[in-house]
């Protein structure tokens, strides 16, 4: 995103992006369950749709808000700012998280309405058990590590594809189905479907996701040191190829063509910073901020 993108516009991008993600996750889950009684087949369809949708949404909304789509991703961005790096301020993080949660609920309700179901009916699928919480810690930690790791080694452009691929895999290799997204988890409690989660299961899942985010940050710091990806709302500047630290661009008051180049480069680089989102299928689909710069 550019340095001139207003917070309201970024919040709108997060709300719409997260809503779109939940429409994909919940809608594909409903469709899959209706078309096949085989849970494995339904999970394949749901995980594929969720991963493809997540990658496209990150690519589309990344230049606007960083496409966090996930409060955990947003919190990692805020933490980077608190520890002397670049990221979102406290007010921005709160606005992002609120927009993501509202979007997730709206997306789940919309998906229910599309299939002629009762919009807003709470899910009845209880997901409890310590093994599921461990699965959420692992899923969320991996998501944050993917985003942080790519951002810190100068490969942020790969985040949309990498996050989508990771979520598709995590849906299968984690016991919880990789919700990995507090906003998405809350939204899915409003859908009594294949991807739903009963309200009483929310506290444990959200707590596990927050813990997983902290673990992911710790692993990124351990593996890559203190190098941080640049913030999505940073001034126009060209990022260093490896560290991801913005380097000032010498002003050029010559032809407009040169000015365009100086402006376009940062926009493309910064779009690759924050994202997210975690989503899952039968058990979850973290969407996350996948994302361009990190946070998230």
Q: What are these language model-derived features?
A:
Residues 1-296:
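Membrane-interface helix-loop junctions and terminal tails of multi-pass membrane proteins
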């Amino acid at each position: 995103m550019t340095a001139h993108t207003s917070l309201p516009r970024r919040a709108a991008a997060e709300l719409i992006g997260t809503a779109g993600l939940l429409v994909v996750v919940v809608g594909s889950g409903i469709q899959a369950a209706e078309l096949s009684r085989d849970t494995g087949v339904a999970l394949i369809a749901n995980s594929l749709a969720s991963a493809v949708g997540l990658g496209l949404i990150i690519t589309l909304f990344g230049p606007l808000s960083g496409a966090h789509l996930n409060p955990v991703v947003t919190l990692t961005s805020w933490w980077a700012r608190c520890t002397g790096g670049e990221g979102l301020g406290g007010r921005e993080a709160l606005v992002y998280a609120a927009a993501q949660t509202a979007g997730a609920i709206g997306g789940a309700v919309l998906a229910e309405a599309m299939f002629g179901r009762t919009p807003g009916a709470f899910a009845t699928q209880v997901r409890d058990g310590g093994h599921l919480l461990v699965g959420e810690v692992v899923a969320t930690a991996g998501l944050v590590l993917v985003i942080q790791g790519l951002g810190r080694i100068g490969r942020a452009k790969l985040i949309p594809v990498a996050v989508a691929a990771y979520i598709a895999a995590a849906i299968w290799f984690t016991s919880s189905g990789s919700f990995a997204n507090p906003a998405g988890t809350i939204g899915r409690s409003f859908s009594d479907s294949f991807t739903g989660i009963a309200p009483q299961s929310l506290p444990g899942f959200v707590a596990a996701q927050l813990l997983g985010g902290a673990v992911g940050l710790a692993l990124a710091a351990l593996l890559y040191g203190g190098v941080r990806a640049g913030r999505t709302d940073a001034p126009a500047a060209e990022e260093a190829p490896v560290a991801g630290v913005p380097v000032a661009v010498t002003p050029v008051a010559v032809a407009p063509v040169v000015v365009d180049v100086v402006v376009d480069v940062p926009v493309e680089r910064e779009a690759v910073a924050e994202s997210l989102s975690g989503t899952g299928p039968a058990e979850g689909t973290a969407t996350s901020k996948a994302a361009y710069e990190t946070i998230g």
